């Protein structure tokens, strides 16, 4: 089996995490997984949704979108269509769920973190890149909130999270699929993990033949190794 990119089966694409990418957001990151590029911002607003008012805890919610020409052919903006597509809703819910699992909401105070992930170029793995980049943006935003005196109960970050795709391509498990691989893969998994090795979410679909337990275990092992490398890159970015 030869991957279109020439990478080894267990090799990530070139990953870059650039902090403070935009001027106004409390936290902002440009995250690049190969040719996939996503701007992730974390904005802080005082107040929480109605169902949380008076409970002394915060909230995090996420939105996801793609520029019209992030892909090979132009797609109409969802705003122009008047509604978000099912894929968009699924991905932004995944991003929100994953990031909430990283935080202790009781330490946020009654503040809301708004996460915006905007894909400026897509070449596979946009949701996993979004989660990985947004985690760094969240940490930067929380530093700003702390300086403002908005954190009363210590650091809300319980654990780091990152995400990566794995799949079965030409009969073999591979890590971090690009678009060419993703579109031809027999199986595609998106895996969100903590830096302690726990799983937050595993999304998997067999596009062709069903996959078996040994293949699933092989893919999860690849994901574990890939996410470990992503945590190292996140920490290196935060140390700059």
UniProtKB/Swiss-Prot annotation:
<keyword id="KW-0820">tRNA-binding</keyword>
<feature type="binding site">
    <location>
        <begin position="125"/>
        <end position="127"/>
    </location>
    <ligand>
        <name>phosphate</name>
    </ligand>
</feature>
<comment type="subunit">
    <text>Homohexameric ring arranged as a trimer of dimers.</text>
</comment>
<dbReference type="GO" id="GO:0016075">
    <property type="term" value="P:rRNA catabolic process"/>
</dbReference>
<keyword id="KW-0819">tRNA processing</keyword>
<dbReference type="InterPro" id="IPR027408">
    <property type="entry name" value="PNPase/RNase_PH_dom_sf"/>
</dbReference>
<dbReference type="InterPro" id="IPR018336">
    <property type="entry name" value="RNase_PH_CS"/>
</dbReference>
<dbReference type="InterPro" id="IPR001247">
    <property type="entry name" value="ExoRNase_PH_dom1"/>
</dbReference>
<dbReference type="Pfam" id="PF03725">
    <property type="entry name" value="RNase_PH_C"/>
</dbReference>
<protein>
    <recommendedName>
        <fullName>Ribonuclease PH</fullName>
        <ecNumber>2.7.7.56</ecNumber>
    </recommendedName>
</protein>
<dbReference type="GO" id="GO:0009022">
    <property type="term" value="F:tRNA nucleotidyltransferase activity"/>
</dbReference>
<keyword id="KW-0694">RNA-binding</keyword>
<comment type="similarity">
    <text>Belongs to the RNase PH family.</text>
</comment>
<dbReference type="GO" id="GO:0000175">
    <property type="term" value="F:3'-5'-RNA exonuclease activity"/>
</dbReference>
<dbReference type="InterPro" id="IPR002381">
    <property type="entry name" value="RNase_PH_bac-type"/>
</dbReference>
<dbReference type="GO" id="GO:0000049">
    <property type="term" value="F:tRNA binding"/>
</dbReference>
<dbReference type="InterPro" id="IPR015847">
    <property type="entry name" value="ExoRNase_PH_dom2"/>
</dbReference>
<comment type="function">
    <text>Phosphorolytic 3'-5' exoribonuclease that plays an important role in tRNA 3'-end maturation. Removes nucleotide residues following the 3'-CCA terminus of tRNAs; can also add nucleotides to the ends of RNA molecules by using nucleoside diphosphates as substrates, but this may not be physiologically important. Probably plays a role in initiation of 16S rRNA degradation (leading to ribosome degradation) during starvation.</text>
</comment>
<feature type="binding site">
    <location>
        <position position="87"/>
    </location>
    <ligand>
        <name>phosphate</name>
    </ligand>
</feature>
<dbReference type="InterPro" id="IPR020568">
    <property type="entry name" value="Ribosomal_Su5_D2-typ_SF"/>
</dbReference>
<keyword id="KW-0808">Transferase</keyword>
<keyword id="KW-0548">Nucleotidyltransferase</keyword>
<dbReference type="InterPro" id="IPR036345">
    <property type="entry name" value="ExoRNase_PH_dom2_sf"/>
</dbReference>
<keyword id="KW-0698">rRNA processing</keyword>
<dbReference type="InterPro" id="IPR050080">
    <property type="entry name" value="RNase_PH"/>
</dbReference>
<dbReference type="Pfam" id="PF01138">
    <property type="entry name" value="RNase_PH"/>
</dbReference>
<dbReference type="GO" id="GO:0008033">
    <property type="term" value="P:tRNA processing"/>
</dbReference>
<dbReference type="GO" id="GO:0006364">
    <property type="term" value="P:rRNA processing"/>
</dbReference>
